[in-house]
């Protein structure tokens, strides 16, 4: 049974994690900051690890762009949850693909580990990330070769930062160019999509 928490920003809604992952204290989370390494505001994305620690979690950080396959596999295997930060979505997808971390994550989620995706981390959870071009630059990911297939953890696409002060207009533009067949789910920074098996709900802090 798949369990996911997909957010624009984790800090405002992190306390909602307990709805899909009870008894957080003492559990371990794999923290993947890779997307934030190619973002001018990456430091703020990485601050989520302090929120995770405040919830009682042990944080194991690993950058999949530079870590070995063995280290990534070991890190994920020893965790109860996987957290993927915001940042540049295209660089994140490229790194997940070339390190094979994406396959390891998808398998772990299928086996019951909870996936927490923030902004870029939420976008890559869907079937395809091409739509996020209106918000993110492809420049940091020259080896994607126009293959925008996401991890496919869910069958819908998150549009983060709707109504936000910085990226709200980009999010609105994505929605203007979408249609019902695209299965877009826009979320504000104070909202989260919680997936618990067949149950999917949009919640607010």
Regions of interest found by a model, annotated:
Residues 90, 122-125, 192-194:
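Short, active-site-adjacent cap segments at secondary-structure transitions
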Residues 1-81, 85:
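N-terminal beta1-alpha1 cap of cysteine-dependent amidohydrolase-like domains
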Residues 94-95, 101-164:
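Class I SAM-dependent methyltransferase SAM-binding "motif I" and its flanking Rossmann-like core
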Residues 149-197:
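Conserved anion/nucleotide-ligand pocket segment
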Residues 37, 87-90, 121, 163:
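Short glycine-rich anion-binding loops that position phosphate/pyrophosphate groups of nucleotides
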Residues 8-10, 191-192, 196-205:
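Patatin-like phospholipase A catalytic core
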């Amino acid at each position: 049974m798949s369990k996911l928490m997909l957010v624009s920003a984790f800090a405002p809604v992190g306390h909602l994690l307990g709805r899909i992952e009870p008894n957080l204290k003492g559990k371990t989370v794999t923290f993947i900051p890779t997307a934030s390494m190619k973002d001018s505001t990456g430091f703020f994305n990485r601050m989520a690890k302090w929120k995770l620690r405040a919830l009682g979690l042990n944080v194991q950080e690993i950058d999949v762009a530079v870590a070995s396959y063995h280290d990534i596999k070991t890190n994920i295997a020893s965790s109860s949850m996987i957290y993927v930060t915001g940042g540049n979505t295209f660089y994140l997808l490229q790194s997940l693909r070339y390190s094979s971390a994406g396959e390891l994550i998808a398998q772990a989620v299928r086996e019951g580990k909870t996936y927490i995706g923030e902004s870029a981390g939420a976008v890559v959870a869907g079937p395809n990330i091409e739509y996020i071009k209106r918000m993110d630059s492809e420049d940091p990911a020259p080896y994607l070769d126009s293959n925008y297939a996401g991890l496919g953890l869910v069958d819908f696409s998150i549009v983060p930062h709707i109504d936000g002060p910085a990226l709200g207009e980009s999010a609105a533009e994505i929605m203007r160019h979408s249609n019902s067949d695209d299965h877009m789910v826009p979320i504000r920074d104070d909202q989260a999509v919680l997936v618990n098996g067949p149950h999917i709900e949009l919640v607010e802090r």
